[in-house]
Swiss-Prot record:
GO cellular component, one term: cytosol
Active site: 93 (electrophile), 141 (proton acceptor)
Organism domain of life: Archaea
Pathway involvement of the protein, from the record: Carbohydrate biosynthesis; gluconeogenesis; Carbohydrate degradation; glycolysis; D-glyceraldehyde 3-phosphate from glycerone phosphate: step 1/1
Subunit structure of this chain's protein: Homotetramer; dimer of dimers.
Family: Belongs to the triosephosphate isomerase family.
UniProt-listed InterPro entries: Aldolase_TIM, TIM_sf, Triosephosphate_isomerase, Triosephosphate_isomerase_arc, Triosephosphate_isomerase_AS
Name of this protein: Triosephosphate isomerase
Pfam entry (one): TIM
């Protein structure tokens, strides 16, 4: 997993249903290539295979609930995420929380088969617990700010600062990214200045009238923070 990174979660928005998901992913891919930055997209499970097989940028699943394939009606197996071409997995989003035991098993399975693993957490202490599971990144997202347009980097910077401090101290190999209310390039820039290595966002990009233009704005700050090759 490369950093700094912009991860665009398409959730189950109507604006990202079917071929619309691919249109957003293509716009993200274009921006990633033009700016030379890392952008990943996380389509809904219905569009995961389509998007993963159509773009070169990383494509992440929004979640999973079983480790391996089998007789699990309406479930999502970690191994099948890899099989359809996705390269990563987001776990424990506040809209899809997991019990600790299940989260631990899913994260371990995903890492064992080579998937990037991002675990979401609502606060610094929970982020530290998530980091103990060995993901590539922890995304700290105060749930009360998600979808509000009130960026965590501006309204709760102390949450980011403390998360970065705790995780860096105890699990230096785990990267901290952040999300919740991120709407503008300025919000992204602020998050990076607070010590994160990227952002996880959704509505700002998905609901934009011009996906390319908005993603370009959101990704531009990554060029300043980009790590040398």
């Amino acid at each position: 997993m490369k950093f700094p990174i912009l991860i665009i979660n398409l959730k189950a928005y109507g604006e990202a249903a079917g071929k619309k998901a691919l249109e957003i992913a293509k716009a993200a891919e274009k921006v990633a290539k033009e700016l030379g930055v890392n952008i990943a997209v996380a389509p809904n499970h219905l569009e995961l295979a389509l998007v993963a097989q159509s773009v070169e940028i990383p494509v992440y699943a929004q979640g999973a609930d079983v480790e391996t394939p089998g007789a699990y009606t309406a479930h999502i197996a970690v191994d099948n995420i890899k099989a359809v071409g996705a390269s990563g997995l987001i776990l424990n989003h506040s809209e899809a929380p997991l019990a600790l035991n299940q989260l631990s098993k899913l994260a371990a399975r995903a890492k064992s088969i080579g998937l990037d693993v991002v675990i979401c957490a609502p606060d610094p202490v929970t982020s530290l617990a998530a980091a103990a599971l060995g993901p590539h990144a922890v995304a700290v997202e105060p749930p009360e700010l998600i979808g509000t347009g009130k960026a965590v980097s501006k309204y709760k910077p102390e949450t980011i600062i403390e998360t970065v401090r705790l995780v860096t101290k105890h699990f230096p190999n785990v990267v901290v990214i952040t999300g919740a209310g991120i709407e503008t390039g300025e919000d992204v820039e602020a998050a990076l200045k607070l010590g994160t290595k990227g952002v996880l966002l959704a509505s700002a990009a998905v609901k934009a009238k011009d996906h390319y233009q908005k993603i370009f704005e959101l990704a531009k700050p990554l060029t300043v923070a980009a790590e040398p090759p």
